[in-house]
Amino acid sequence: MKYLLSYTPEVREALDRNRPVVALESTIISHGMPYPENLRTAREVEEIVRSQGAVPATIAVIGGRCKVGLTDEELELLATSPEAVKVSLRDLPVVLARKSLGATTVATTATIAAAAGIEVFVTGGIGGVHRKSPGDPAQMWDVSADLTVLGRTDITVVCAGAKSVLDIGATLEVLETLGVTVLGYRTDRFPGFYTRDTGFGVDARVDTPEEAAAVIHARQQTMLPGGVLVVNPVPEEHAMDPDEVERHIADALKAMAAEGVTGKAVTPYLLARLKEVTSGRALQTNIALVKHNALVGAQIAVALKAGK
């Protein structure tokens, strides 16, 4: 993997000097938000990371290379190009071989970041176990590769929980089976992306970046496979009402089943539907939580380097 990596000078220098670096995914740019909000948010998130003393490394696949850190022109390309494809692990060899423009999912970003020696990765929300479509009890479980990658990759992922469109209980069961440590940042509850509490708990609560870093460092010392998931609830002023979100998701799932949407198109479809039916409020919540995660993730990355 390492010989396929290309770095921006800023990221390469930071890694060489053992400075804190924060990985960022690119699917949120190409598939998670519309233009121009996607480009503006990507730029603002990178600046938030820098403001805390860390270096941002947005990851994507461009020209047959795994890019660790993007130029502003590359960010704009991902934000505007209809040719950008969503790259999970199974897609990575194809996208590399064809030299396509690829936006990396949580699973692929985590894999590339770990190969580059980056310890902390910030995203909006992780994938997980999808809910079954109404009226189809025989439907197979759709389980995101994000979970299996977290179970085998030494990386810390900071997010606002699992996306609300997922089966949260089943997702947490898989994380437990894989041995992933789930930390709640200033919370005892597992958040659900748009909402602050899904009704499920976390493995442990941490209230400072230093406390989170201590747990991460202890896990690294154990040499256990897999990583740490730090869940950081969306700020209260931007959180959505859980009952409203559930109602919209139920309606969206019915529409999705009627339209035959499957596979990697599911999450973008559901997020777009939520944006539409909430008159853009879901998008604003998404932007707010990503920025909040960038702030906390950068602080944890700095604390992790300082504590070693």
Swiss-Prot record:
GO BP field: nucleobase catabolic process
Entry binding sites for substrate: 86, 106, 144-146
Source taxon at top rank: Bacteria
Role summary: Catalyzes the reversible cleavage of pseudouridine 5'-phosphate (PsiMP) to ribose 5-phosphate and uracil. Functions biologically in the cleavage direction, as part of a pseudouridine degradation pathway.
Assembly notes: Homotrimer.
HAMAP family the UniProt entry points to: PsiMP_glycosidase (MF_01876)
Family label: Belongs to the pseudouridine-5'-phosphate glycosidase family.
Protein name from the UniProt record: Pseudouridine-5'-phosphate glycosidase
Organism whose genome encodes this protein: Symbiobacterium thermophilum (strain DSM 24528 / JCM 14929 / IAM 14863 / T)
Gene that specifies this protein: psuG
